[in-house]
Amino acid sequence: MKTAEKLGIIGTTISIFGIGFGWGVFPWLIRMQIGRVSLSPGSETREFWEKIPFPIDFKIHIFNITNHVEVQNEGKIPNLQEIGPYYYKEWKEKSEMIDYENDDSITFFMKNTWFDNKEKTLPLTGDEMVIIPNPILVGLITAAEREKKGVLPMINKAIPILFNKPDSVFLKIKVYDLLFGGIIFNCTTKDFSASAVCAVLKKEAPFLETVSRSVFKFSILNQKNGTEEPLKLQIKRGIKDYTEVGKVIGANGKNKLTNWRGRPCNNLEGTDGTIFPSDISEHQDIWSFNLELCRSIPAKFVRKSEYKGIPAFRYNVTIGDTSTDPSLKCLCINDTFCWKKGAMELLKCSGLPVVATLPHFYDSHEDFLNGVKGLSPNEENHSIFFDIEPMTGTPLYAKKRIQFSFPLGKINKIDLTKNLPDTLLPFLWVEESIELPDYLIDKLNSELFRILQFLDVIKWVITLFGAGVVSGGVGLYYKEKNSLPITPTSSATSKKIDNPTDKTTTHELGHTNFGYIN
């Protein structure tokens, strides 16, 4: 009996150890170790953060307007033809990094560099001609209508001089020139109105690239290619407190933005978008700062997913609804005008009055889609999402997509707009996609998941071994119980038992244990 009891106690203890450590302590220790990631100078994480060691796929789609004459003269609904994608390899890195030991932070600028990926772009070459809203002309008119209505008559007089007597707000241009070559804008003039407009543009149009003293140009990528973004960010390194790694705490030396009409739109939330927290729960949003939108934006958990055998959480991102969400009212143009669901204007962000939405007006108000023809929004091709490994916070697979559109419509005192339809006209949309390379997948597997798999086996071995010891103790207990020796009775007693009339028989029978020893 003592051996059986000992086996039961030992087995139970082993099983409890296996369950407690295997399902509780081991995972906790791993999460604690993995979670202690920081941007310590010289560390592998810091090097990866400073420059992503592989190029990101970057794609651009251009919208060609096939009925621009009818749109300009008759106010017809624009008919769009999507041209693309044009592929590029995008390298992302940080520059001018300065570490601050006192508050465990680092300041830096983002820098993107694009290289043409001609093989993927084929059969397109960039020589394709497209008709688009003239970004300088439409941008100038719209910005003035938003901010300085009093200068609209002056702009109306300056348009024929600065834009060579245009008969339309639309422009025919080669795709390459739109993306890199540039749209030339010549301010060489002695006309007072034109000179005044040029003076304003020089001061308030950061999207224009200077060619000479009086000549400028506009392109989508050339001015930004290989140059620092104008916003200097400050984030936590996570050396003193690993839970704060990547947290944005400053922009251009301030602890909040100044682009928008107030809080919470000017608040800095989450990380810089290139590093994420570890030990993520599906019940929490993931916040990050988006440079293109000049705002922090949350990603919402959608479902559990998997990427190349690695368990992941899928999150998606939407623009939001400035017209109904009280927390987004500060993104509205003014007290009386807010864009409907899925749209936000970037005049206060980029200096150009374009409107950001998801491509093809996916997850946006139906009025936007009804205002044009030729779009087919769907989740697979037009949503923003990413898959992230929750224990380490490693992004595994992501697609970030943004469409840029120009507000179109009649603007008082601008002759060229008198017949234009009121619509939001898509201009182009871009996609950044990232897939963690196989060599990094193997690294993640070898340093994390193979350890987890090993521990998973160990915890079951320990638990089942303990259960086996308990089972052995139980078996031994019953074996001992069933194999106890039988004590033979005397012949006299037997005779007494055989004689039911003998009184002493009852007395002896009352003290027998039927052959068992207590």
Curated annotation (Swiss-Prot):
The main place the protein resides is membrane
Q: Which domain of life is it from?
A: Eukaryota
Could you list which ranges are Extracellular topological domains?
30-456
Residues the record marks as carrying a glycan: 64, 186, 225, 316, 334, 381
InterPro entries, sorted: CD36_fam
Q: Name one GO cellular component term.
A: plasma membrane
**Cellular localization per UniProt:** Cell membrane
State the Gene Ontology BP annotations. sensory perception of smell
Is the keyword Glycoprotein in the record? yes
Topology relative to the lipid bilayer, per the entry, is: Multi-pass membrane protein
The record places the following residue ranges in the Cytoplasmic compartment, namely 1-8, 478-518
The disulfides recorded in the entry are 265-330, 294-349, 332-338
Q: Which Pfam families match?
A: CD36
Asked if the record carries the keyword Transmembrane helix, the reply is yes
Q: What residues form the membrane-spanning segments?
A: 9-29, 457-477
> Which keywords has UniProt assigned to this entry?
Cell membrane, Disulfide bond, Glycoprotein, Membrane, Olfaction, Receptor, Sensory transduction, Transmembrane, Transmembrane helix
GO MF terms on file? scavenger receptor activity
Function noted in UniProt? Plays an olfactory role that is not restricted to pheromone sensitivity.
Q: Which family does it belong to?
A: Belongs to the CD36 family.
Protein name (database record): Sensory neuron membrane protein 1
Species assigned in the record? Pediculus humanus subsp. corporis
